[in-house]
Amino acid sequence: ESIEVAPDGFSGWRLSTSWGTFNVLHMEDFDWSTIGGEVWGQIPKDARVSQSEGTSFQLLAKDGDWRAEHLPFGNVLEGVEVLGDLIEMPCGGLRFEGQDVLFFWRGEKKGQPLSKALVDDPVATCKALGEKLGKIAMMAMQKSSSVNEERIWNDRLKKMEDRLKTNTLWRASHSPETRGTLTLRHLRPEHIRVVEGGIILGGIWGGLESVLLEMSQKRPAISDLGAAFTVVHEFCPQNQRQEALRTLGESWVSEAPESISSRRALDGHRGGLHIWVYEAMLNRMMMARAMDEDETRFVDRWLAQVSTIQAAMFQARSWSALALMCFSASVLVPLAWLWGYMSWAQMVQVPAFLGAGFLLHQIYRARAPSPW
């Protein structure tokens, strides 16, 4: 269904899908040589398209090479400007009714896609990516930190499970250290490039993903790491995948704030990183169905392991329950002696219960799923 309101060079449409109804601005006979309307920042002068792929355009202009990205669903950069030193921010754009519909950058796109780098040198690439995401987490937490919104995060998982009709069900009792902050939200490989061992992050302004996935901006920084793990599962060769994942996680920990990367914060018994990899896998599945793409096998393989992970976590909790019983008994025995139900000789049970409790608790901790 067409809509009348649209900027010059665009046509407006209302797109109805099983996931909802969205307004879309389609680029149509856009005049790159005279970009008018509500422009901001620096834009190319007298440009023409030299190459295009999807919503991305390479431009030749009087003042050099430029790149442009069309945002059919609009976007607002508000909030992410604080990450400008660590991500590739546009130098200008075209706005319509408060939403950006075009972004511009000077120069050509540099480096190789992350998907190719993960095949050529997965471990080094994961090290650089983890460090980059850790630095972003550090800066984001310094600028903005909200309370733990466990209920909202778990409700979103339920909504996706219901929509996708998955055979999985997973909720997490997130640790108190898990707090919301500015994140990249939907980290996808086409948004990431590798240049001389360094990482260039772009494309955090969204597209259909930002509309369809309904992600709140304030999410835990570890959710970006979970999304990165999903990308590694998709593109990294199997024989190097485990080492690459471990390197990605450890390099993130080396740069991220200790408050969100400590052993307690990554506690697998409380979901840790695994719950965010799970969410990212559901995101990937949802996008595949929305775009009528073949569902990726790596998602199916990972989701098939969820029940195994949950079973191991349940078994580990049995050790925790036994430890709690021993600690409780170490308190009840002295009380029973005070009330006259036990003799002094029986107080020897107290250190035995305490020792057993500590031992069982250590077994419980040792059985926690690996963070990576």
Predicted regions mapped to residue ranges:
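Conserved ATP-binding subdomain of kinase catalytic cores across diverse folds
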Residues: S2-L169, L212-N239, A356
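Cytosolic/matrix-facing juxtamembrane and C-terminal tails of multi-pass cellular membrane proteins
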Residues: S115-L118, A366-W372
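Catalytic-loop of the protein kinase fold
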Residues: E177-H191
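Cytosolic-side membrane-insertion boundary helix
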Residues: R301-S330
